[in-house]
Regions:
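A broadly conserved amphipathic alpha-helix scaffold signal in soluble, globular proteins
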Residues: 13, 107, 111, 152-156
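Beta-rich nucleic-acid/ligand-interaction surfaces
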Residues: 165-184
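N-terminal leader/assembly segments
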Residues: 1-68
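Amphipathic interaction/junction segments at domain boundaries or subunit interfaces
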Residues: 45-146, 163-164, 169
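Short, internal active-site loops enriched in acidic
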Residues: 32-33, 137, 170-173
Length: 185
């Protein structure tokens, strides 16, 4: 499974913003030699990278180093990634719509970042949406949590207030899919 450079480029940016240059260096030093060669200077946003080596493991290292193993770091990293993409390269996408508009397109967004992957929107109405990831061969809890954090911030950016994202089913827990229940005001 692979991840697009646009998804991984935000990790070192997030770490540097939150934990400074020293934190970024500590994190980079903890990575595998292959990942150290790419992070942070050589990430190409249009390239595809092996998911485990360049997203899953680096996120876990970040959570271990700066959050005492708490996956809250993955959530915060997902929020940062949404800011980066939805206020930057995909700004027009958000400006045109509402949280409902954005969530209706969730199925087309996920495969832009992860391949192979599939997401479908089961329900989308004012104040609530249910999205299901039905295909994601190398799902990891740290990735589900990062995706949930991304969704939360995307809802805020598109005008939703007090968003709440719950992972109600999880591929990592043996469920046939990962399900995200999003609510907002």
């Amino acid at each position: 499974m692979e991840v697009k450079g646009t998804a991984i480029i935000t990790i070192p940016l997030f770490i540097k913003e939150r934990f400074g240059e020293g934190g970024l260096n500590r994190w980079r030093d903890a990575l595998t030699p292959e990942a150290r060669e790419v992070y942070p200077a050589w990430v190409l946003v249009s390239s595809w990278y092996p998911l485990k080596e360049f997203l899953t493991e680096p996120l876990r290292k970040m959570c271990d180093l700066f959050y005492a193993g708490d996956l809250k770091g993955a959530w915060e990293s997902g929020r940062f990634s949404a800011d980066y993409s939805l206020k930057g390269i995909y700004k027009i996408f958000v400006k045109l719509g509402s949280p409902e508009f954005m969530l209706r397109r969730a199925g087309t967004i996920l495969p832009v970042y992860y391949t192979p992957s599939e997401m479908k929107v089961v329900e989308c109405r004012k104040g609530q949406g249910i999205m299901q990831i039905t295909k994601f061969p190398d799902m990891d809890q740290v990735l589900e949590i990062r995706i949930a954090g991304w969704m939360e911030r995307a809802i805020e950016i598109s005008g939703g207030k007090q968003p709440n994202i719950k992972i109600t089913k999880s591929l990592t827990a043996g469920d046939p899919l990962s399900e995200f229940l999003a609510t907002w005001k």
